[in-house]
Every structure is written in C-alpha cells, then in structure tokens.
Design a protein with these regions (language model features):
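Hydrophobic transmembrane-helix bundles of small-molecule transporters
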Residues: 181-230
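Transmembrane-helix bundle of Major Facilitator Superfamily
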Residues: 1-202
C-alpha cells in the first residue's frame, strides 16, 4: 500500500549510500571522493611548484617584465573557477563538469610541455590545468558537504585541507628538484591524476537540478573578479 507523507518537504540532499541507476556512490563515497581528491592534490603540486620556480621559468623563456603573469593569470583563473563551478554544479551534472575538467588537464599538460619555450604557451597551459583540477575540487566539496553523517562530512572536508597542505609541501619540493633538471616536467604532474579514473569510474553523479544557468550574470561576475585582481 502506498503511503502519503504530509508536512513540509526537506531540502534534497545527496544520500551517499543510495545505489542509483547511474552508479552514483555505488560503493560508498570513498570510491568517488578520494580519486577527486587525488586529482586536486596533483594539480596543487604543479601549481605550487610553478609558484616557486616561476622566475627561473621566466629567465629560460625570456619573459622579462612579464614574468609575473606566469603565476598571476592562473591565480585569477583559480578565483573565477571556484565561483563558476560552484554555481554550475547546481544546474549541470557533476559528472559532466569532472569530465570537462579531466579533458582540460590533459590538454593543458600536453600543450604546456610541447610549448614550454613560449610564455603564452606556458600561461595558457597553466590556466587550462587550473580550470581542470579546480573542477575536481569543486565537485569534491559539493559531494562532501552533502554527506549526512556529520563525522564523515567533517572527515572529508578535513581531507581537502590536508590535500592542499600536502600538495603545497610536495609542490615546493618538486619545484626545487625539477628546477635544475627540467622545470617543464612540472606541467606533466597533473597527468598522474588519470590513474584515479579507473577507481572512480562513472560513479560521479550524473543528475542535476532543474533550472537555468544565468550566463549573463556569470559573465559579469567573472569579468568583475578579473578586473579586481588585475
């Protein structure tokens, strides 16, 4: 017999133990969240490594007074991406966002390594990589903060902070080592995140809330954020 539940409906949350037809959290949150965390951590390693050796990079490619752009542009992209993905995650399936992010990481890594002698090539490549790994980070936080169990939610949010700190430390170490070998190898580090894909599979949720993306609003906000940081 059917049951009728009366009362105010609560806001929808992600049930991490629900086995959905699209594979959402089929084996628990760890099979989804930890691979996303790995992708983010490797992106942080590359980012922080470049922040350490950017003057050496500028010297090798003859960037001159434009050397600051090597770190400034990816930093601006990171700030805009944090807001952008957080908003798009309400309307676009997280799986699609993650798929696009992986594609951007691959494109940025290969492009940057191939054109590592060009200032524009390095900047564009690092911007693409930043957009890519931040997609994984945003998807991670959206899913982690939706976990109902407060202890597990706190654990996964804490792991994100640990991944950033660990990625920063390893990035500094990697930058110092690779600066004297070949700093362009820093651009290939995010590719190691591809090893996380078989673990994650297609378990990232493919569902999205109904609604319309305010393209104009996003464009205005992104432009203002860009102007404020320049």
């Amino acid at each position: 017999p059917s049951q009728v539940i009366r009362g105010t409906a609560s806001a929808p949350t992600v049930n991490v133990r629900t086995i959905a037809t699209d594979g959402e959290y089929a084996d628990g949150p760890a099979r989804v969240l930890l691979p996303l965390l790995g992708i983010y951590a490797l992106g942080t390693v590359s980012l922080q490594g470049f922040n350490l050796v950017y003057l050496r990079v500028a010297q090798d490619i003859g960037a001159g007074d434009a050397s600051g752009l090597i770190t400034a542009i990816p930093g601006i992209v990171l700030g805009v991406a944090c807001f952008l993905y957080g908003t798009l995650g309400d309307f676009i399936p997280l799986r699609r966002i993650v798929d696009v992010g992986i594609a951007l990481i691959v494109a940025g890594s290969l492009l940057g390594f191939a054109f590592s002698s060009s200032l524009v090539g390095v900047i564009v490549a690092r911007a693409l990589q930043t957009l890519g790994y931040q997609a994984a980070a945003s998807a991670y936080m959206i899913l982690a903060t939706a976990i109902r169990d407060p202890k597990k939610r706190g654990l996964y949010v804490g792991l994100m902070c640990a991944a950033f700190q660990g990625g920063t430390a390893i990035g500094m170490l990697s930058g110092g080592i690779l600066a004297d070998i070949n700093w362009a190898l820093l651009l290939l580090i995010p590719l190691a995140g591809l090893a996380c894909l078989p673990i994650m599979g297609r378990r990232v949720p493919a569902r999205a809330h109904a609604g319309r993306v305010d393209i104009v609003g996003l464009a205005i906000f992104s432009s203002l954020a860009l102007l404020l940081t320049l």
